[in-house]
Amino acid sequence: NKMSLALVEISEYVTINGLPWLLLAWVSIYIFRPLATIIHEFGHAIPAVIFTRQTVQIKVGAGQGSLHFSIQSIKIEISLKKMICGYTAFQNVNLSNCQLTLIYATGPIFSLMACTVALSLIYTIKFHIALDALWVGWVCSNLLCLLRNVLPLQLQGPESDAVPSDGLQIIRIMRGRTPTES
């Protein structure tokens, strides 16, 4: 039974010997969270480039970026402050509601794919417990990113302004409003 197998594997962490691995998983959540944000934003940027045929900008973190680079038509700026926040900027003037919905949905889809791939690795390949702990941190980081963006909420923005989550943007589009309208 897979459920009992999962519980047995989890129980390895809830012992005095498992405490270091539990701490490693916890710390890796914070280490991987900026990468989870970048993956999520790439989920938005790829269809935005396809639909707009223009350059798209990804910004991760707050303040002036300390790292600037481009990959094809995607300009990336990364700041080391508040790296759990990010956004993808693109021209949405001539996009249909279907295209906008796809752009907003693909960020969470990329986060979900990152979780799914890591979970499948954890359950199909026998890694050392330290690597399992890192994979658990990776899953949790991407799951937090997914939940933060799917729930229809106003989120704390990188510059202290409230920004709508992807879920809220999609609901606004379905109600016939432009994504930035309340």
Question: Residue spans of the language-model regions?
Answer:
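Short, strongly hydrophobic alpha-helical membrane anchors
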Residues: 1-19
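Hydrophobic alpha-helical segments of integral membrane proteins
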Residues: 7-10, 39, 46, 80, ...
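Helix-boundary and loop/linker segments of multi-pass membrane transporters
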Residues: 14-22, 89-94, 130-131
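Membrane-embedded alpha-helical segments that form the functional core of polytopic membrane enzymes
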Residues: 18-38, 132-147
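Small-residue-rich helix-interface/hinge motifs
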Residues: 26-93
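Hydrophobic transmembrane alpha-helical segments that form the core helix bundle
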Residues: 93-182
